[in-house]
């Protein structure tokens, strides 16, 4: 999860990173 969180944060996810990751996995 650290890799995905790092990527989202790098893109500018910040605090929303982990939440977006969870939604993305559920959507997929």
From Swiss-Prot:
It comes from the Eukaryota. One of its GO terms (cellular component) is extracellular region. GO terms for biological process: adaptive immune response; blood coagulation; innate immune response. The keyword RNA-binding does not apply. Keywords: Adaptive immunity, Blood coagulation, Coiled coil, Disulfide bond, Hemostasis, Immunity, Innate immunity, Phosphoprotein, Secreted. The modification Phosphoserine is found at residue 3. It is found in: Secreted. Conversion of fibrinogen to fibrin is triggered by thrombin, which cleaves fibrinopeptides A and B from alpha and beta chains, and thus exposes the N-terminal polymerization sites responsible for the formation of the soft clot. The soft clot is converted into the hard clot by factor XIIIA which catalyzes the epsilon-(gamma-glutamyl)lysine cross-linking between gamma chains (stronger) and between alpha chains (weaker) of different monomers. Heterohexamer; disulfide linked. Contains 2 sets of 3 non-identical chains (alpha, beta and gamma). The 2 heterotrimers are in head to head conformation with the N-termini in a small central domain. A long coiled coil structure formed by 3 polypeptide chains connects the central nodule to the C-terminal domains (distal nodules). The long C-terminal ends of the alpha chains fold back, contributing a fourth strand to the coiled coil structure. Cleaved by the protease thrombin to yield monomers which, together with fibrinogen beta (FGB) and fibrinogen gamma (FGG), polymerize to form an insoluble fibrin matrix. Fibrin has a major function in hemostasis as one of the primary components of blood clots. In addition, functions during the early stages of wound repair to stabilize the lesion and guide cell migration during re-epithelialization. Was originally thought to be essential for platelet aggregation, based on in vitro studies using anticoagulated blood. This is Fibrinogen alpha chain.
